[in-house]
Amino acid sequence: MTVVGSGVGFWALVVVATLVGLFTAWTLGANSNSPPFAPAIGANAISTMRAAFLIGILATLGALTQGGSISETVGSGLIDGVAITSLAATAGLLTATAFMAFGVYSGYPVPAAFATTGAMIGVGLSLGGTPAVDTYRQIAVFWALVPPVSGGLAYLTATILRRDDIPETVGVPLLAALVGGIVANVRLGVIPAPSGADQGSIAGLVAGVVRTPTVAGVDLGAALVTLLVAGASFQFIRRRTQESVDQGVRTFLVLLGSVVAFSSGGSQVGLATGPLENLYRVELGLPGIALLAVGATGILGGAWMGAPRLLQATSREYAQLGVRRSIAALVPGFVIAQAAIALGIPISFNNIIISGVIGGGLAGGSAGVSRRKIGVTVTFWLLTLVTSVAVGFVVYRAFAAALGV
């Protein structure tokens, strides 16, 4: 292992940067992981404390097994020509955390991904780096597509669940089949990828072990595993709904909340660990899993210590939404979060859920959807991105001047 730098100042920055990263992860664990189980609590399918416990465990597992791609993007993909130093990482994390804290205490919608992305671009430019325009273009397109795609999927889901000619003993199991099929193809760091990629999926692993032909670019083995998992999911929830519709829906809410919480951890941890990528993996020579473990620890602490209070508040809101609209909001959240993880795109999980809630609300009429609130939300998203770039730039320059770097 090669350690770059050995002075007291260097190690002091390592400690400070790590502590700030832990606090950022704690904040994300407390604030970004409550939506998955809120509908289940509102439907009396699970208690608040048990939900908080599961959120912590599942989000931590998601962070450890899926957090690497977004962490790498935040740490090295936003700026070209320079490496993020420990001082720059500290400045970027402090800037992003300050924006998140402002959002929590003011009540204004401040997306964590926008704040972190902007802050890291700012400190990178302050270091003398050049903008990674291609990466910005990919991120911008993905972010722009999130509201219509999440809202559209939620609208479609809510519409299907509201149709009288589609009984809940069919509609809910069909959604379970969709989720199960996606789970079979979720990329996990603990599963070896036959293609040599960093992460593999259950379907991909089976396809690599059992040789099957490929038709139109689709591996039949992977497709068969996907169909089997989807079919098993459909049959399990269908049996539950046939015994009792309410019990079946509650079971689906808990299982859906579980996979969404897992995805939330995988999509959010990179916002806390990304700025530390160069410090841990290059300067300290540590493996990526060590850095993800730091972030996962923060998310676990935040979920267990901060989530119960937020769960009680959000569960009341989801109870007012109703079961159908709650499911409609969570299904797109799972799909889009997994797409972001696969592409390495930093994303704020709450943004996806907000768009899903709006889409589900439109399925029942637009009376509950405030255009003014939507406008204020989008405005603050854009303001967060722009101002975090400027603040990150200034904060790093101030730190560098104060320390004589």
Annotate each PLM feature.
Residues M1-V405:
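Hydrophobic alpha-helical segments
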